[in-house]
Amino acid sequence: MSDNKQKKEVLKKAIGKIEKTFGKGSIMFLGEENAVQNIETISSGSVAIDIASGVGGYPRGRIVEIYGPESSGKTTIALHAIASAQKNGGIAAFVDAEHALDPVYAKNLGVDVENLLIAQPDYGEQALEIVDELVRSNAVDLVVIDSVAALVPRAEIEGSMGDVQVGLQARLMSQALRKLAGNINKSKAVVIFINQTRMKIGVMYGNPETTTGGVALKFYSTMRLEVRSIGKITEGKESIGNQVRIKFVKNKVAPPFKEAIVDVIYGKGIVRENELFNLAVDEGLISRRGSWFSYVDSTGTEHSLGQGKNNSLDYLLNHPELLDEIEEKIREKHGLLKKGEKSEEESLE
């Protein structure tokens, strides 16, 4: 017993030393409930993703990688983060290396396209220099790079089609991230790199998938989000969207491996009322009796939302104060109330 106590004391000192050297959150128990730290974040624009992140969104001063197969919803998730940053008075920039941003779709997701900074660089070095300048200005809250695969080094663009350019992009990313990481940390901006997956040739065992641009981004990222479409959303016989799973395969500021499942509707993205309804049902805030749904608000009044999900969503859309209350309750339950906000119980006191 005394041996055990002694071990705990030694471990406590070791953890204290590690945190002093490498910062708070560099080591923690995986099952810690209070692993949520007082970290400044930018909301992802999705309550489910904020919960899975463990800290209420993407941490400021850090690099985040969002990766997955084609058409899995990576850019949609990044655009929701931009809309969220702008909604809270922040300035966002989109480095469109793929030259594929759809302003109409971005606007549908809530992005203020009139005030969104956009760059369409000709080659990788130019894109990363633009990111560095924006970050060092200390005036930008969020920068999204879409995508790493499109950050083609200048030497490759200026060379001939048949030239063999081994490891150029990986070297470019490694060099750029060494410089960027410190500047990002000082500026308190969030930099999101969107990345694509590729299949490794000749892999017999393990996961044959890998991401482009070498391994530097994996190391420098505080969070790595794997985005995958896991099913279609249908209305009658018509497909209206995809069910998407977001897995935090790396998280330096909270326990990793948490998942969020969101509905991404074509042309609309992650619809707030739909997401809150699904979460409220899962959390037991909205009760279900057969096909009827009901909700008891903070005053104790029971609201019969309607029969079926669509009627219930219509009711909530006509009563936006209930949607706000549901979101607050969900965030409070997961310890994600923003700084300065109080829970309903604290407000009553």
UniProtKB/Swiss-Prot annotation:
Keywords: ATP-binding, Cytoplasm, DNA damage, DNA recombination, DNA repair, DNA-binding, Nucleotide-binding, SOS response. Its main location: cytoplasm. GO terms for biological process: DNA recombination; DNA repair; SOS response. PROSITE patterns: RECA_1 (PS00321), RECA_2 (PS50162), RECA_3 (PS50163). ATP binds at residues 68-75. Pfam families: RecA, RecA_C. The keyword tRNA-binding does not apply. NCBIfam families: tigrfam_recA. This is Protein RecA. The lineage of its organism: Bacteria, Thermotogati, Thermotogota, Thermotogae, Thermotogales. The gene is recA.
